[in-house]
Amino acid sequence: MRIGEVIGTVTLSRVHPSMTGFRWVIAVPFSLAALREGKPDGEDLVVFDSLGAGAGSKIAFSEGGEAAAPFHPERKPVDAYCACLLDQVVVTEQRTTDNGQRTKR
């Protein structure tokens, strides 16, 4: 699962019958460094959205086979799925010491 920011919507002229009544949004993923800065920096992607994410919303999304999991046992043509709307993202930097223990900075 990754975190991204919605930057727009997609309008379809035709859609698979099993996908009617839902939206598609354009999202830009965050790298860890971008999360610290609050600016997305990944490549735009189209995400299936049944939660109503709007422009500027931060979302968590799954991709690939996991994106279709919420519809099981139905088969849906989905490659990226908006799993939740995020109110806040807090990045706490952690490092692993030589002996494998995690420390916070």
Model-flagged regions — what are they?
Residues 60, 66-96, 100, 105:
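C-terminal structural segments of small proteins and small subunits
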Residues 9, 30, 64-65:
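Short, surface-exposed secondary-structure boundary micro-motifs
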Residues 37-45:
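Short, structured beta-strand/loop micro-motifs enriched in basic residues and often containing a Trp
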Residues 19-27:
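Short aromatic-glycine-enriched beta-strand elements
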